Amino acid sequence: MCLLARVRHIEITPDVNGNMFFWHFQNKHIANKQRTVIWLNGGPGCSSEDGALMEIGPYRLKDKDTLVYNEGAWNEFANVLFVDNPVGTGFSYVDTNAYVRELDVMADQFVTFLEKWFKLFPEYEHDDIFIAGESYAGQYIPYIAKAILERNKKGGESSYKWNLAGLLIGNGWISPPEQYEAYLQFAYEKGIVKKGSDAASKLEVQQRICSKQLAVGPALVDNTDCEKILQDLLQLTATSKGGEQRCVNMYDVRLTDTYPSCGMNWPPDLDAVTPYLRRNDVIQALHVNPNKVTGWVECNGQVGANFKPSSKPSVELLPDLLKEVPIILFSGSEDLICNHLGTEALISNLQWNGGKGFEITPGTWAPRRDWTFEGEAAGFWQEARNLTYVVFYNSSHMVPFDYPRRTRDMLDRFMGVDISSIGGKPTDSRLDGEKVPETTVGGVAGNGTDAQQAEKEKLDTARWEAYRKSGEIVLVIVAFSAAGWGWWVWRERKKRRGYMGVSGGENISPSGEARGREGFRDKRSAADLEAGDFDENELDDLHMRTPTTVMGGEGNDPRYSVGAASEDSEDEEDVKGKGKEKMSG
């Protein structure tokens, strides 16, 4: 199977060398209509290659040299466009004095990117467009959606209205007041902090300071006093073991990490992704502009340090967006930094489309419907008035990392994928025990492990049949050749007996041995994306052969997240944020 992928930079702000990098994968199947999903990781300053190679892209890295197929990839029924946003993130770049500071500026630049992208690829401009992401993308996505809707309303003869069909935000940083307060609440619920303990008393004091700041100050995306709640929580709950301090992994509380990393060494795939994206052959295959002089880092600390928006938090944009666009918020149950309790609190306090929270009539709330996926308890769904909320059980901050197939089921359901014209075995996905509209995850006709195995067996059978027929032909040829050879030998011997006295009796040996067959062998092994030769002067199309042998399974503020400088530059730090400089998502 071959996948069509396109990669390159698009210039956004030429006066400051602002360029954005994208990686686009074409869909494998078209189910009733064309769709494009735009994926953004968070940070701010964290690369969407995280999403491409560790979450929803068609490949995962088994190690730094081996790509394997991701059975839950989101490009089954949708084109997927990964963008390193804002400028300076991942393979994107900009002059160091021109990093983005505000969310509205970021959104305007992203619309500029899309305008230029659709000029390059006009065949996708009529697609249903979905914008998805996680963590600090909970700020990016609503602002970008607002900018797109405003662009559509301005119109113009040359402006086609983009069909913004939906937004998906996973473990998003959306509403600081509720989400800051949820740190300690979540820690109590999970037993990380015991109520009444010294640690609890100290954290409650800091939470009161935070609440006071939020009450008197302007509504901002982040607050230093509130950030300290999480910093103190991780420090106060750290333990010593074997001379090493360990702390809770803030992205998956089932795990621990060395202090003060507390999750920055996670996920484990990062150990392979970073060296892979720094390989010269990969950089060349991805057509990374030579003007990008530093190596890839997951999160650019300078982007995060400069991103200090005075913009209002994105939660304030949701009511108007929900009038026009369906939104799905989803949460991994084991994430601390953007935990589900905070998301549920912000939904409960939100007023939209004539109601508050998930109240469907006065005193009646939309039910939480138990979700099972292939016979296992997967989480629950809740929805009302254009907003859907999904919790994934036993999952981290990066839900698609843990459950790519379940998130694909969620995506297909949200997009309204109709598989009736495609075939394949429907996925057993149920809400409250009832079969829901059918989706297919890894089981589309001609796709998935079963189909691939059947196709392999079919090809093997055809191959051996060809060999058998070829063998029969060869036997006939050999028989005729042997007869001809025998006749030729008999004739030559007869000649030599007549000319022996003249020729001196030398035996004339025929020369018929072929030479140089090694030169015809293609010694290049089955290739992943970097193996082919690409013309730098042409549109950057990467045709990637799907591996089938291995299948993938299911700043200046005292912010905790600021990490060590990267190997490449003091200006770039490998930082994770929640959104904020706290998470790669």
Curated annotation (Swiss-Prot):
Compositional bias segments (type: Acidic residues): 530-539
PROSITE patterns: CARBOXYPEPT_SER_SER
Cytoplasmic face of the membrane: 491-585
Subcellular location(s) of the protein: Golgi apparatus, trans-Golgi network membrane
Molecular-function GO term, any one: serine-type carboxypeptidase activity
Keywords: Apoptosis, Carboxypeptidase, Glycoprotein, Golgi apparatus, Hydrolase, Membrane, Protease, Signal, Transmembrane, Transmembrane helix
Pfam family name, one: Peptidase_S10
Glycosylation sites per record: N386, N394, N447
Family indicated by similarity: Belongs to the peptidase S10 family.
Function: Protease with a carboxypeptidase B-like function involved in the C-terminal processing of the lysine and arginine residues from protein precursors. Promotes cell fusion and is involved in the programmed cell death.
UniProt name for this protein: Pheromone-processing carboxypeptidase KEX1
UniProt lineage: Eukaryota, Fungi, Dikarya, Ascomycota, Pezizomycotina
